[in-house]
């Protein structure tokens, strides 16, 4: 697969799957016997959500949202939830938490629908970039401030399909 110039390996596919498996086992233990709903923000979280839900050995429902938050503008909904999450146990599935603006908006919107519980799982957490006080409940790995590409993470829509995650020197 052609790589973009300036890409340095950060996490291999095997390392990613090990993180995903650990997160899935933790979620599975916590939600055993409960109605679980995974919310997958498009586009970046699709690969992580697909891998995570296949590793969670529980009945679950998945729904998708798409939000946009251009720099300096407010968050807008491009695709909203299609299922009722009232009194359901909801987990937002994020591939990476950066500034937290979009995730904070989504969390508040979901809480307004009165789920039984709401938690956040993040494959990668980048607290150094946080603009809002939002914390994931489950984290695959906490990272420093770096620009990553692959496994759903993109550079102008390129690289989401890479199996590994790369540090991208802009």
Specify the residue positions occupied by each region the protein language model found:
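PRPP-associated nucleotide enzymes
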Residues: 1-170
């Amino acid at each position: 697969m052609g790589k973009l110039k300036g890409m340095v390996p950060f996490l291999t596919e095997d390392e990613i799957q090990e993180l995903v498996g650990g997160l899935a086992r933790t979620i599975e233990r916590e939600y055993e016997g409960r109605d679980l709903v995974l919310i997958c923000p498009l586009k970046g979280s699709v690969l992580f959500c697909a891998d995570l839900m296949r590793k969670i050995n529980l009945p679950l429902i998945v729904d998708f949202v798409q939000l946009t938050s251009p720099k300096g503008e407010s968050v807008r909904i491009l695709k909203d939830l299609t299922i009722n999450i009232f009194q359901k146990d909801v987990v937002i599935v994020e591939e990476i938490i950066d500034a937290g603006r979009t995730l904070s908006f989504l969390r508040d919107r979901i809480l307004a629908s009165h789920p039984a519980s709401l938690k956040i799982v993040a494959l990668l957490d980048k607290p150094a970039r946080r603009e809002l006080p939002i914390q994931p409940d489950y984290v695959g790995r906490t990272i420093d401030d770096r620009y990553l590409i692959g496994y759903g993470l993109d550079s102008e829509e390129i690289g989401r399909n890479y199996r590994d995650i790369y540090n991208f020197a802009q």
